[in-house]
């Protein structure tokens, strides 16, 4: 069965859909879901092939976005973390009428380093793909450790991420590989210049996967968007700075 796992909480007049990152599932939001569901009608989603959304193989970004949209409210703020940021961005590009505001968290329109564009070196992503077939649990754990490195709470944040992964069955290797392929190949820098809705980009100053150098570059490329950097966060600011993170989303709600 190809079913997207979807949970709705709260009674707010604005809908907020949260999309998680690579290798993870919607349990990653448990540190903030109570707070957010007191302000929004909150939608927690396991991306196709991840967590409880079983029965999917590797999907393209476009197919992943369409699969998620089928169960979504008519209009919502879409928030995507890391890989989820690409999915939310794709939805904003193809179905702008469904997106009240777009929020990307520790995400890049182009994760892979290119000429004069900072990002993850393509051989690092290719290495992760190679290691997946050898020892995919260890590969996922390495990727998670990278996400919290450098923060004051790095160890406990990494434990929180690992617990999220281990709480549910691991995704299939081809699903994980497909997610890495999206991170390796997708480039939405130019298309996102023209999104019509409010667009908020959140970053961690210490993020080892999305270099902070991209922030001023995107400020220039997307002058209609707003950016905010969590000074002491890495790749998962909602885990290390949950109160500050929720404040920003509640403030955004007042503006849309």
Curated annotation (Swiss-Prot):
- Write one Gene Ontology MF term: pimelyl-[acyl-carrier protein] methyl ester esterase activity
Catalysed transformations (reactions): 6-carboxyhexanoyl-[ACP] methyl ester + H2O = 6-carboxyhexanoyl-[ACP] + methanol + H(+)
Q: What class of enzyme is it?
A: hydrolase
The positions flagged as active site in the entry are 82 (nucleophile), 207, 235
Gene Ontology CC entries for this record: cytoplasm
What compartments host this protein? Cytoplasm
Give EC number(s), comma-separated. 3.1.1.85
Q: Where's the AB hydrolase-1 domain? A: 15-242
Which protein are we looking at? Answer: Pimeloyl-[acyl-carrier protein] methyl ester esterase
Q: Which gene encodes it?
A: bioH
